[in-house]
């Protein structure tokens, strides 16, 4: 829990900057057509549908086709979000893409999206905070709108994790899926939209979830390829302990910063990593099932894309409506976490 002094200090800073509000005026998602079921995985590795569902809650996931990339998926989601917002790309001031699986080390995937949609006025950059990346990017774009620096921002979470997986490792290949989700944020004098943010990290856990090679420490070589260092490595037990410890706590803190009680929240949208983690956090927050968004069964862990994809499904299915309060929470590699509250 936040100390009273810290709460007052952070709230004052956020409220001083919030003379303008950053409203979500458009949303969109994209998931590849190809569905990979647990039954299909059971023919590839030593696993079963029962084993996967008991441990993760996942039934199937989407896998990108060969011609699809993180940028192309992000572009699909961006166009859908702009369509819902009723805006053309030249209305955008900023594009942020949160991803751990960019098309290239450089240039930024956001620049590829900017070119693809024709958002010629927009600045563009990427954010990398693993599965917490989208909510982190949302805090950046929202804060820039609230400060008056910009009027509109396109925030995207997109991943093509399937390209990095070891499809012989049943402990990792069953977990992940591909996809993208996007928000369009717009400045407004009306109270609402993004109300608070809470970010944190525990860098001492940096080795807990890591893709060891491909960066400047271990650049591409035959040795790194032979050693399998271009595949994600995860201490699943440590990640579970971290996630269940952090997710409920940061959701509470974000609510406090927005002067909200958990009873005021219509929907909790957590990162869709694992059903057991989601259930543990929901129990900690004493939230009933109808107030918790779950779609990990259909998409698996889509990393930075999971929160916006889940939000889009909640909106499209009528789970949330204008005026509702929502909490978004992401956590992942770093170890890092981020939460935001918003009013629709």
In which residue ranges do the predicted regions lie?
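Buried hydrophobic positions in well-ordered alpha/beta secondary-structure cores of metabolic enzymes
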Residues: 24-26, 52, 81, 92-95, ...
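Condensing-enzyme catalytic core mediating Claisen C-C bond formation in acyl metabolism
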Residues: 5, 10-66, 169-241, 245, ...
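Flexible, glycine-rich active-site loops centered on histidine and acidic residues
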Residues: 146-180
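Phosphate/pyrophosphate-binding loops at sites that engage ATP/ADP/AMP, CoA/4′-phosphopantetheine
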Residues: 77-93, 249-266, 314, 318-319
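Acidic, glycine-rich active-site loops and adjacent beta-strand->loop/helix elements
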Residues: 30, 98-103, 129-132, 157-162, ...
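Catalytic phosphate/nucleotide-handling subdomain of diverse soluble enzymes
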Residues: 309-329, 337-344
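Active-site pocket-lining segment
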Residues: 230, 243-248, 262-285
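Conserved catalytic cysteine-centered active-site region
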Residues: 51-72, 99-153, 283-311
């Amino acid at each position: 829990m936040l100390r009273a002094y810290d709460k007052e200090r952070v709230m004052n800073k956020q409220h001083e900057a919030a003379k303008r509000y950053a409203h979500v005026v458009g949303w969109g998602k994209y998931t590849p057509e190809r569905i990979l079921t647990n039954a299909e995985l059971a023919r590839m590795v030593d696993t079963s549908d029962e084993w996967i569902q008991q441990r993760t809650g996942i039934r199937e996931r989407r896998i990108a086709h060969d011609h699809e990339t993180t940028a192309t998926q992000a572009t699909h989601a961006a166009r859908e979000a702009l369509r819902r917002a009723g805006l053309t790309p030249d209305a955008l001031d900023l594009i942020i893409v949160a991803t751990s699986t960019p098309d290239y080390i450089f240039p930024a995937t956001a620049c590829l999206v900017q070119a693809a949609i024709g958002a010629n006025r927009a600045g563009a950059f990427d954010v990398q905070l693993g599965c917490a990346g989208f909510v982190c990017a949302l805090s950046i774009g929202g804060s820039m709108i609230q400060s008056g620096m910009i009027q509109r921002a396109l925030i995207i979470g997109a991943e093509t994790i399937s390209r990095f997986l070891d499809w012989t490792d049943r402990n990792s290949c069953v977990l992940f899926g591909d996809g993208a989700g996007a928000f369009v944020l717009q400045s407004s004098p009306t109270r609402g939209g993004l109300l608070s943010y809470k970010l944190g990290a525990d860098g001492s856990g940096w080795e807990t979830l890591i893709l060891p090679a491909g960066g400047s420490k271990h650049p591409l070589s035959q040795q790194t390829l032979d050693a399998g260092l271009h595949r994600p490595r995860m201490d699943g037990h440590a990640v579970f302990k971290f996630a269940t410890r952090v997710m409920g706590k940061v959701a509470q803190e974000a609510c406090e910063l927005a002067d909200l009680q958990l009873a005021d929240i219509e929907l909790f949208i957590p990162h869709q990593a694992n059903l057991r983690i989601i259930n543990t956090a929901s129990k900690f927050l004493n939230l009933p099932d109808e107030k918790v968004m779950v779609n990990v069964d259909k998409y698996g862990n889509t990393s930075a894309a999971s929160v916006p994809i889940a939000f889009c499904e909640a909106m499209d299915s009528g789970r949330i409506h204008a005026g509702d309060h929502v909490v978004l929470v992401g956590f992942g590699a770093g170890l890092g976490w981020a939460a935001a509250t918003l009013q629709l």
